[in-house]
UniProtKB/Swiss-Prot annotation:
Protein name in the entry: Threonine--tRNA ligase
Manner of cofactor binding, per the entry note: Binds 1 zinc ion per subunit.
Enzyme Commission code(s) on record: 6.1.1.3
Catalytic activity: tRNA(Thr) + L-threonine + ATP = L-threonyl-tRNA(Thr) + AMP + diphosphate + H(+)
Function: Catalyzes the attachment of threonine to tRNA(Thr) in a two-step reaction: L-threonine is first activated by ATP to form Thr-AMP and then transferred to the acceptor end of tRNA(Thr). Edits incorrectly charged L-seryl-tRNA(Thr) via its editing domain. Deacylates correctly charged glycyl-tRNA(Gly), but neither glycyl-tRNA(Gly)(2'-dA76) (the terminal 2'-OH of tRNA(Thr) adenine 76 has been replaced by hydrogen) nor the 2'-fluoro tRNA derivative do so, strongly suggesting the editing function is tRNA catalyzed.
Complex formation: Homodimer.
Keywords recorded for this protein, A-Z: Aminoacyl-tRNA synthetase, ATP-binding, Cytoplasm, Ligase, Metal-binding, Nucleotide-binding, Protein biosynthesis, RNA-binding, tRNA-binding, Zinc
Recorded name of the encoding gene: thrS
Effect of residue 134 to A: Isolated domain has nearly wild-type deacylation of mischarged L-seryl-tRNA(Thr). No activity on L-threonyl-tRNA(Thr). Same results
Length: 625
């Protein structure tokens, strides 16, 4: 079943003609109708719903009721609408399910109207236009599900209701449909994405074209979808990001470890943990035993901590692994370039804290660490939106702490609040990048976990020598490395749309300087300049192609080279270079040593790796036709 929910000022319809040979019998007064201040449910009943009409009806009633509660609508209008699906159920089944939904909503106390089934109808509707006003839901009967989720868990999840707010740095908590989004358009887009929960990629995001054009990353037809290949320039960027985040986390105080990529389905602690997640694992068979490929570093780090002897003096205890790879079998329609993959590289730190106060202190520090890490890759708070999620009880007890976090970011954030705890954590934040298609992807995240220490048997000895269960903070200060690359490319696509020059952060640029001789006569001097730069650990190449100077410059511009160095007779005679700086468009003549000094100052504190391709352009293969 597909459901489109529109919170409306009114809806009115008029029957025009029969659409089916045997439509629903109706009286004269059913040929037209109107309802005001209403949640309209446009519904397509699908072929798969024939497997279990009762279950689909109950789930639809539940979903529609939840949304009606969120938008505070007392009136609900059920509108048969075949155009949400191409796989429709038999008319008799569809009519039965729609009537079940209609009656079920009435039994829940709503004032319910409906349009007749099987007719062509004209209708008018006035959508209210707030963030909750347009939502969609897909409901699938259990027999049709590919994934298996435990019945008790599914029931709990279905009953979980999210309450959405905007929290300002001044501490004002505002219901999301009452917040004035003027000046916060990106936040509005993020809110709409979060509440609608539509993860399907309808079209290709701009970063995909850029990753292919720049020969960074490509699809691998010989592998499972969502597993990518990286060309030399893309591997360099990814490798530098991995090194950068790892250095930041170790500098923060984490101990780096390495753990297996596969785990036993039947391990008691892992079995319980898996029940908290949808069954989207890759399965590996070894003899007659089944293993799953990890979707995070939690398992391995928890097993190490379970076996360790830990004192209260060791807390907070931070452990880190860069997982290459973590695996998650995302739905095919949700896979999208670098944004959502089935194999991804995740920097994953877990911190043990003795109590909630120490956990809050660490949470705040890791919030700041995440901001710092993203700033280093060229993403400021203006580039991402923040979501903070917690229970109502946590808000009541720790409101001032939450407001402190919002003050750090300096702008309004989205709040998701629950009446009771369903997940293993009591507090979570994410920094979310909203791309050019208005899709959001979580980057940095931290959670306070209150379940898994006991589940895995992780303990520490307190001041009195008694064993206690610590709290666990899950932290990825950047999010998946592939997602960071996605965010960088999507940001550059936005700049291009605004008529600005795109470029990678200087320390991440595969080639930082391109030296172009004005003719073959000056190739030796170009190589001399390149040698000086390379000796200073600057990634440099030389365009030795037999082409006109303007074409070479255009090629370097198209590749987003930060510094284009042109050398000819004057430069060779004076021992200088002429530089075009992409960042500000400035062109100037200088000495090699001065350019080295400028680049080293701008890349100080960031990791370095050598040039990923041959020095001379004429020696390079093309990876894409």
């Amino acid at each position: 079943m597909r459901v489109l929910l529109i919170h409306s000022d009114y809806i009115e319809y008029e029957v025009k003609d029969k659409a089916l040979k045997n439509p629903e019998p109706i009286s004269e007064d059913m040929k037209r109708g109107r309802m005001e201040e209403v949640l309209v449910a446009f519904i397509s009943v699908e072929k798969v719903d024939e497997k279990n009409p009762e279950e689909v009806s109950l789930k639809a009633i539940e979903e529609i009721s939840k949304v009606a509660e969120q938008v505070k609508a007392e009136n609900v209008f059920v509108y048969p609408f075949a155009h949400l699906s191409s796989e429709l159920a038999k008319p008799s089944v569809a009519m039965d399910i729609l009537n079940r939904v209609y009656q079920g909503l009435k039994e829940r106390g709503f004032n319910v109207g409906k349009a007749p089934f099987g007719y062509y109808k004209a209708f008018k509707i006035s959508c209210k236009g707030h963030p909750l006003a347009e939502l969609s839901r897909t409901i699938v009967p259990e027999e049709a599900r590919v994934e298996e989720v435990p019945e008790a868990l599914r029931k709990e999840e279905e009953e979980l209701v999210s309450y959405w707010y905007i929290l300002t740095p001044e501490g004002e908590l505002i219901e999301v449909d009452k917040f004035d989004f003027t000046g916060y358009e990106n936040l509005r887009k993020f809110v709409n994405y979060e509440i609608a929960k539509n993860r399907i990629a309808e079209k290709e995001p701009p970063h995909v074209k850029l990753m292919l054009e720049h020969e960074l990353v490509d699809y691998e037809p010989g592998s499972d979808p969502g597993n990518l290949r990286y060309y030399p320039k893309g591997r360099l960027i990814k490798s530098l990001l991995e090194q950068y985040v790892t250095e930041k986390v170790i500098e923060y105080g984490a101990m780096e470890v390495e753990t297996p990529i596969m785990y036993d389905f039947e391990h008691p602690a892992l079995e319980k943990y898996l029940n908290r997640f949808p069954a989207r694992q890759y399965i590996v068979l070894s003899g007659d035993k089944r293993y799953f490929l990890r979707f995070a570093a939690c398992f391995g780090q928890f097993m190490i901590k379970k076996d360790a002897i830990i004192s209260y003096r060791n807390l907070p205890l931070r452990m880190y692994e860069l997982t290459r790879y973590s695996f998650r079998r995302e739905k095919r329609g949700e896979l999208s370039g670098l944004r959502r993959l089935r194999a991804f590289t995740m920097p994953d730190m877990h911190t043990l804290a003795k109590d909630i106060e120490q956990a809050k202190e660490e949470f705040k520090k890791q919030f700041k660490l995440s901001m710092e890490v993203l700033e280093g890759v060229g993403l400021t708070p203006e580039d991402y939106e923040v979501a903070i999620r917690f229970t109502e009880d946590f808000w009541k007890e720790h409101k001032d702490f939450i407001v402190e976090l919002v003050k750090l970011i300096g702008k309004p954030v989205l709040i998701e609040m629950w009446k009771q705890r369903f997940f293993y954590f009591i507090l979570k934040f994410e920094f979310n990048f909203v791309d050019n298609l208005d899709k959001a992807a979580a980057l940095s995240t931290v959670q306070i976990d209150v379940e898994n220490a006991e589940r895995f048997g992780i303990t520490y000895y307190d001041e009195n020598g008694e064993e206690k269960y610590p709290l666990i903070l899950h932290c990825s200060p950047s999010g998946a490395i592939e997602r960071v690359m996605y965010a960088i490319l999507e940001k550059q696509a936005k700049l291009m749309n605004e008529g600005k020059k795109p470029m990678f952060p200087l320390w991440l640029s595969p080639i930082q300087v391109r030296v172009i001789p004005v003719s073959e006569e000056y190739l030796d001097y170009a190589l001399y300049v390149a040698g000086k730069l390379e000796g200073a650990k600057i990634r440099v190449d030389v365009d030795d192609e037999d082409e006109r100077l303007n074409k070479k410059i255009r090629r370097a511009e198209k590749e987003w080279i930060p510094y284009i160095v042109v050398v000819g007779a004057r430069e060779k005679e004076n021992g200088t270079i002429t530089v075009r700086r992409r960042e500000d468009g400035k062109q100037y003549e200088t000495r090699i040593e001065e350019l080295i000094k400028e680049i080293k100052e701008k890349t100080e504190g960031f990791p370095y790796k050598p040039r990923p391709l041959p020095l001379l352009l004429s020696k390079r293969p093309k990876f894409r036709g």
